[in-house]
């Protein structure tokens, strides 16, 4: 018996929509990363992008446990000496709702060209509406 290896042009991609209202950030991110990677499919192949498209709505209503709203820090650097910036989860959710989820999912995906292709299939929206009704996404409960 030969080992099955999925071919990129044979992969069937489904669309799923997740409502993130009052869901914990890490639990949503891990499920999204698993589905973007395609590990839930029997034809999963590590070197082929077999994942599905994921739409996350109500990302502004994500929550974290404990005191992470004020204690969890995100860092970025301008490239200049002394140009490090930090912001908390709470401030990031106010300014850019959904970016914390994008960063969490991106950290769970492989680094390199395959991971970059996977993160492009994630669509995050702060409100409860999205422009992907034509794809007829299935509701995914977490």
UniProtKB/Swiss-Prot annotation:
> Which Pfam families does the record associate with it?
Ribosomal_L13
Task: Give the GO cellular component terms, alphabetically.
Answer: cytosolic large ribosomal subunit
> Could you tell me which InterPro entries the record lists for this protein?
Ribosomal_uL13, Ribosomal_uL13_bac-type, Ribosomal_uL13_sf
What GO molecular functions are on record for this protein? mRNA binding; structural constituent of ribosome
Instruction: Tell me if Ribosomal protein is a UniProt keyword of this record.
Output: yes
UniProt KW Ribonucleoprotein keyword: yes
Which SUPFAM superfamilies has this protein been placed in?
Ribosomal protein L13
| Coiled-coil residues | none
Transmembrane residue ranges: none
Gene3D superfamilies, per database record: Ribosomal protein L13
For this UniProt record, the keywords arranged alphabetically read as follows: Ribonucleoprotein, Ribosomal protein
Q: What does this protein do?
A: This protein is one of the early assembly proteins of the 50S ribosomal subunit, although it is not seen to bind rRNA by itself. It is important during the early stages of 50S assembly.
The family assignment reads: Belongs to the universal ribosomal protein uL13 family.
Matching PANTHER family, A to Z?
A: LARGE RIBOSOMAL SUBUNIT PROTEIN UL13M, RIBOSOMAL PROTEIN L13
How does this chain assemble? Part of the 50S ribosomal subunit.
Name of this protein: Large ribosomal subunit protein uL13
- State the species of origin: Ralstonia nicotianae (strain ATCC BAA-1114 / GMI1000) (Ralstonia solanacearum)
Gene symbol of the encoding locus: rplM
